[in-house]
Amino acid sequence: MDMRVPAQLLGLLLLWVPGARCDIQLTQSPSSLSASVGDRVTITCRVSQGISSYLNWYRQKPGKVPKLLIYSASNLQSGVPSRFSGSGSGTDFTLTISSLQPEDVATYYGQRTYNAP
C-alpha cells in the first residue's frame, strides 16, 4: 500500500535581527512536496549572503512550538532521530530525511543563527 505523506515546507523566510538591517533572505525549495513513507527527502535552503555554517533547521507541527533538529548546519540536536541530517555552508544548505516517517509531516524551515544552542 502506497502511503503518501505530504511534507509542507515554508517557502520564503525574511530574517530580522534587532539592531541590524533586514537584508538577508533565505529561500527554501521545494515550497511543498508529497512523498511516501520510507522515501529520502531533501530540502534546500539558499541564503542571499554567506553565513558560514550559522544555520539551524527546525520542524514545526500545527499548534506546537518549533523543534530544533539541526544546529550549525550539520549538528544533530540531542534526541532527534538519526534519519535527519544537515549539510552545507556559506550560501547553500540541505536538510535530509533519509527515510520519511508518518510523524515527519510538518513544516520545515531554516533559520540563520549566530551561535550553537
Curated annotation (Swiss-Prot):
Sections of the chain in a coiled coil: none
PROSITE patterns attached to this UniProt entry: IG_LIKE
Protein name according to UniProt: Probable non-functional immunoglobulinn kappa variable 1-37
InterPro entries noted in UniProt: Ig-like_dom, Ig-like_dom_sf, Ig-like_fold, Ig_V-set, IgV_Light_Chain
Location of this chain's protein in the cell: Secreted; Cell membrane
Organism: Homo sapiens
Task of the protein: Probable non-functional open reading frame (ORF) of V region of the variable domain of immunoglobulin light chains. Non-functional ORF generally cannot participate in the synthesis of a productive immunoglobulin chain due to altered V-(D)-J or switch recombination and/or splicing site (at mRNA level) and/or conserved amino acid change (protein level). Immunoglobulins, also known as antibodies, are membrane-bound or secreted glycoproteins produced by B lymphocytes.
Keyword Iron-sulfur: no
Keyword Transport in record: no
Main subcellular location of this protein, as a coarse class: secreted
